Design a protein with these regions (language model features):
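Globular "head" domains of long coiled-coil molecular machines
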Residues: 66-331
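Charged, amphipathic alpha-helical linker segments immediately N-terminal to NTP-binding catalytic cores
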Residues: 1-49
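Pre-Walker A adenine-sensing motif
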Residues: 53-66, 70
């Protein structure tokens, strides 16, 4: 009964999404302005970029419906504990932790029953390969002394630079926690190096969710449970302060808007900081289009003069989140 109802609802949702796509295709064929009575042209309230963005949104929803996939986007500042939270949900360490921004590109972590060892798929690696070729030439021509002045060159960065000089490309497939850690760390160091060498990182090539890296692994807490239709996927998003790249804010907003729900990880000790404010603004920009939840991390660092749990919920719900989330959605 439950499975049949779910199937019928998904079929109806898919029909409505396909109908919306057809309507957009009709809009694409219409002129962007029409003659007015007195004025030569009257602008219509849509544009080609707007239509393209709507197409991307509908395609993303169709992809989720076809897989019955629930995508929970997780957002937070660099030190709020976002990676730790994701690792806790998965039940094993699938994301590395370093004392620097670690999510240059959004990453999907998908529950895959029976997949005990994590595997990372990075099929859309071509833009990274092109970037490596550009960086290879820049490294040959650059002043290393100047580079060390603008970039912290630790052992990981030095290994990456050596890899670029040798022309070693990224793989499309990584099996096991350590190879995955190495890939993700290298991607983030690649962002830092590209910025230092004044080379544009191809963020736009990874705007579509089907192009970003995907980690597949069995979530420990879901192992052995009765099988139900559907799939749970976490989306690790770049925080607004990740990698010092302001234009990542647009990518963050797009990814949040396309998720099934959003979980914001806030640092209890930094609730009124600028960085946490940027996270809250990104969440508020989503509005009521997706369900919102908040996880307050590091609450154990309170002292006897600190607000209690109910006071913190009231602060976040009312003052910080401007009433767009109820205290019951704050944990």
């Amino acid at each position: 009964m439950y499975t049949q109802t779910l199937y019928e609802l998904s079929q109806e949702a898919e029909r409505l999404l396909q109908l919306s796509r057809q309507q957009l295709q009709l809009l694409e064929k219409m002129p962007l302005s029409v003659p007015g009575d007195d004025a030569p042209q009257l602008a219509l309230p849509w544009s080609q970029p707007n239509i393209a963005e709507r197409h991307a949104m509908l395609n993303n929803e169709l992809r989720k419906i076809s897989r019955l996939e629930m995508v929970l986007a997780i957002v937070g500042t660099m030190k709020a504990g976002k990676s730790t939270t994701i690792n806790a949900i998965v039940g094993t360490e699938v994301l590395p932790n370093r004392n620097r921004p670690m999510t240059a590109l959004p990453t999907l972590i998908r529950h895959m029953p029976g997949q005990k060892e994590p595997v990372l798929h990075f099929s859309h690696v071509a833009p990274i390969d092109c970037l490596i070729q550009k960086l290879q030439q820049r490294l040959r021509d650059c002043d290393i002394k100047h580079l060390t002045d603008v970039l912290e060159i630790d052992k990981d960065m030095r290994a990456l630079m050596q890899r670029i000089e040798n022309g070693v490309a990224f793989e499309k497939y990584y099996l096991g926690a350590q190879p995955i850690f190495h890939c993700l760390k290298s991607l983030n160091d690649l962002v830092r190096l590209a910025k230092a060498l004044d080379v544009d990182f191809p963020f736009s090539a990874y705007a579509a969710i089907e192009h970003i890296p995907v980690i597949e692994v069995e979530f420990v807490h879901l192992a052995g449970l009765e099988s139900y239709p559907g799939q749970l996927t976490l989306l690790d998003t770049p925080g607004p302060n990740e990698a010092g790249q302001p234009h990542l804010q647009k990518m963050l907003n797009q990814q949040l808007a396309r998720a099934s729900a959003v979980l914001a990880v806030l640092d209890y000790t930094q609730l009124k900081s600028i960085s946490d404010e940027e996270v809250r603004e990104a969440i508020l920009a989503v509005g009521q289009s997706v369900p919102l939840y908040v996880l307050v991390n590091k609450f154990d660092q309170q002292d006897r003069n600190s607000d209690d749990a109910d006071q913190v919920r009231a602060l976040i719900s009312g003052t910080l989140m401007k009433g767009c989330i109820t205290p019951q959605q704050i944990f």
